[in-house]
Amino acid sequence: MNMKNKDKLRTCIWDMMEARKISNPEKPCHGRIPDFKGSKEAAGMLRSTEEWKKAEVVFSSPDTAQIKVREYALLDGKKLIMASPNLERGYILLDPLKVQGSEKAASSKEGAFKFGTNIQRFPGVDLVVEGSVAVDMSGGRLGKGKSYGDTEIVHLFHEKVIKEDTPIATTVHEIQIVDSVPVEAHDQKINMIATPERVLRIF
């Protein structure tokens, strides 16, 4: 699949995921980062990587598709930074030592506000995980069209808490990997893709 128009590509992915019943029927995926069947397994694939095992601080988008990523980070004793939805309330830091026994609850959007604290100063980030609508094998990433993911990554670079070689991953369904994602100058690239079946590294 190779489309030059971002909106057309988003609509195509959303339509396919709904038609093939890959997206969560309780949360229509149009206009969203899709919550897909297999998101738990994709998080598990990411969890099995050396990049994950070495990471002490994980940054995650607040999307439902990445909820297991956030839960696994806390269960594995990693500090977790979550962007607040639409970045309306900044960034939230969750300490695994303070949520023991409540990792599942703390990994939700509501739970992050309950158990976490707003970040005043960023710690170094070892792994970034973003949600995506579509990705390609050159690192192109397409979000839902609001530029939140790009803004988050740019902010982390600006704060000097990530470097060019920091793993920037996404968890997606195989159907979300396309031939080419339209990329503009402001778009931030990823370098890892985890699906329910495999992990792909982009060099």
Positions of the model-derived regions?
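N-terminal active-site beta-alpha-beta segment that forms phosphate/nucleotide-binding
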Residues: 2-119, 123
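Conserved phosphate- and dinucleotide-binding cores of soluble alpha/beta proteins
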Residues: 89-203
